[in-house]
From Swiss-Prot:
InterPro entries xrefs: UPF0231
Family: Belongs to the UPF0231 family.
Organism: Aliivibrio salmonicida (strain LFI1238)
Pfam families xref list: UPF0231
Protein name: UPF0231 protein VSAL_I2591
Amino acid sequence: MDYEFKKNTLDGTYHANFSMGHEAMGRWLVEDVAKDTELLAELYKQIAAVKNTQDEWKLSGKVMTLVLTDQEVIVQENALFENSEEEFEEDIHIYDDECISVCGLEDFETMLQSWEAFIRRF
């Protein structure tokens, strides 16, 4: 999972560009986490709690839902969770890479640390 963080110096907005297949992770960072250091602290706490357990932790944000397990992290648009029981029509296609991302727990923790270091600099 490759990523790059940028800040627009004109309007102060943050951008998180992720490699193909992980675009939803960038949306989640920018739209649901942003500069919320209290949320980052809670995420680190929950990562430690799920390591080496069968536990799962879920956080529903404004736009995305995050699911932590001992092996992986899933970030998915809230609308997909709401419609997960429904079948979509065959002619309707969702560009999944923008709606859902999956990565390993350790990669996720490293990415969060990078994001936190980035937002603290600006």
